[in-house]
Amino acid sequence: MSYERKYAEALSRVIGEELTIDQIEALIEKPKHEAHGDLAFPCFQLAKAYRKAPVMIATDIANELNDELFTKVEAAGPYVNVFLSRDVVSKEIINTVLEEKSEYATHEARNETIVTDFSSPNIAKPFSMGHLRSTVIGNAINQIARKNGYDVVGVNHLGDWGTQFGKLMVAYKKWGDEEAVRANPIAELLKLYVHFHEEAKTQPELEDEGRAWFKKLEDGDAEATELWQWFRDESLKEFQKVYDLLGVKFESFNGEAFYNDKMGRVVEMLEAKNLLVESEGAMVVSLEEENLPPCLIKKKDGATLYATRDLAAAIYRYETYNFVQANYVVGGEQALHFKQLFSVLRKLGYDFVDGMHHVPFGLILQEGKKMSTRKGRIVLLEEVLKEAIEKAQANIEQKNPDLANAQDVARMVGVGAVVFHDLKNERINNIEFDLDSMLKFEGETGPYVQYTNARANSLLRKGNYDGSPFTGADDDYSWGVVTMLNAFPHVITRAHERREPSIISRYVLDLAQAFNKYYGHVRVLEEDAGKQSRLALVKAVTLVLTEGLRLLGVEAPEEM
């Protein structure tokens, strides 16, 4: 139970029935200055019922309030401020962390499911830096949802359908080499695709051939289907290398193609509700009442569109997983598409749409410009991660040349630096990409938090921590750490409610800072009766830092 809750219960005993415990708890604040105590309750809402000025009410409550949890209660104007007993609270919090370990701040299972659609690269195209944000934000949102007690289904809605596959088939049959594709699938398929477009400038009939092959694929032709499946399988193997580096897993790889046989039903439903209208030969759903442009369902030639497929996917996911929430971690430029999608689902009478959220994010910039190409070529995410690992290895060799598992640590630090940097600020902001600054061991970086955790683990080894409990402390530096550890459950809840991983990034930075301040002022390893208790505090910090980083998709090496 939180201390806000405990304070609310103590206040309730004095206030009586004017406010419920929940209402009291919602009003409790944290004073801006330490001198004003740990928690504050404003009395304005009681003025009408008590027919007194809030200042007088605060004085009355302060005089009556007593609990072993508080060392001091004072009225400060219209506020009742309490000072928590550092000894009681610190023992309770740190020993709870030590007992629950990585389960600290984990909610009980809710038996409710959240579906998150994220990453979703296009088959036969490079996995570029452009896919980093959706992948790491979606992964963190899922980990945080699990911590909050939800079952989670991560969906990689692959771009595995479309006329480009017809073109690719023509290119492969004319100029392709099976061995070359197997050796380097994405680069080879991209080369063939680019070559097709070059040739089509002088041979426009190639476009017709491409359309014909895609038609064969749509009609279930065996050769076309086999080629498509092969392109998809080879691409996925390549993508998997990146997912393995990032430690990202999915429960479903159902991409666009999966919904081919499910779109007809959507069109029938729209027709049955008289929602389809003709517009310049195409079929659309009018969203005039919602002040949105019409949603295109079928093109002139009868081909279904992106929106039709997403409608089919949303309905399928609800019918399959019975989700309470569905997140789409997709760039901000798709905002209109999702407004239209949710509006059409609402018109179809689906109330599950209330739990659907577009989770947008900003761009990755380099020197202020969109980072998608380097010297005219696409920046591959795998290349960037490998470069980060190499740079991390160089930093580690300089700092700790004798480190036993240096390669493994370099991978954790290099990849962790890239992921942490992406999740450090609110996701809606653009991020400036600079590998050297994000790999620094000081400042607001992943390596700073990882290094703090490694330093704490080193103290535990040097001090031979024996698993003893924490016996209490009332100095300011210990208290700074304790209040941070106490905040973790609240941080977990807030990060989930806002679908905002940066709340956890900020938290682990603040906890690392509080610990480094403690480490700088308290002689942790001094051989006296309190040593094992001090190490218990250090152990609690390592547990929470490691878990906080894990939720972001960042590993925490014990040595660096």
Swiss-Prot record:
InterPro entries: Arg-tRNA-ligase, Arg-tRNA-synth_N, Arg-tRNA-synth_N_sf, ArgRS_core, DALR_anticod-bd, Rossmann-like_a/b/a_fold, tRNAsynth_Ia_anticodon-bd. Keywords: Aminoacyl-tRNA synthetase, ATP-binding, Cytoplasm, Ligase, Nucleotide-binding, Protein biosynthesis. It catalyses: tRNA(Arg) + L-arginine + ATP = L-arginyl-tRNA(Arg) + AMP + diphosphate. Monomer. GO terms for cellular component: cytoplasm. GO terms for biological process: arginyl-tRNA aminoacylation. It is an enzyme of class 6 (ligase). It holds the Pfam family Arg_tRNA_synt_N. A motif ('HIGH' region) lies at residues 121-131. Its EC number is 6.1.1.19. This is Arginine--tRNA ligase. It comes from Exiguobacterium sp. (strain ATCC BAA-1283 / AT1b). Belongs to the class-I aminoacyl-tRNA synthetase family. GO terms for molecular function: arginine-tRNA ligase activity; ATP binding. It is found in: Cytoplasm. The keyword ATP-binding applies. The keyword Cell cycle does not apply.
